[in-house]
């Protein structure tokens, strides 16, 4: 699967640097 950032999107954004929201999961760029 895709490398995730270990975080879910909050208000469509991710707090982890260089991560992008693909709701509801944050993925590495």
Curated annotation (Swiss-Prot):
Modification after translation: This is a cyclic peptide.
Pfam families associated with the record: Cyclotide (PF03784)
InterPro entries: Cyclotide, Cyclotide_moebius_CS, Cyclotide_sf
Disulphide-bridged cysteine pairs: 5-19, 9-21, 14-26
Crosslink feature (Cyclopeptide (Gly-Asp)) location: 1-29
Keywords: Cytolysis, Disulfide bond, Knottin, Plant defense
GO biological process: defense response; killing of cells of another organism
Record function comment: Probably participates in a plant defense mechanism (Potential). Binds to and induces leakage in phospholipd membranes, particularly ones containing 1-palmitoyl-2-oleophosphatidylethanolamine (POPE). In vitro, displays cytotoxicity against cultured cells but no hemolytic activity towards fresh erythrocytes.
Similarity comment: family membership: Belongs to the cyclotide family. Moebius subfamily.
Domain remark in the UniProt entry: The presence of a 'disulfide through disulfide knot' structurally defines this protein as a knottin.
Name listed for the protein in its UniProt record: Cyclotide mech-2
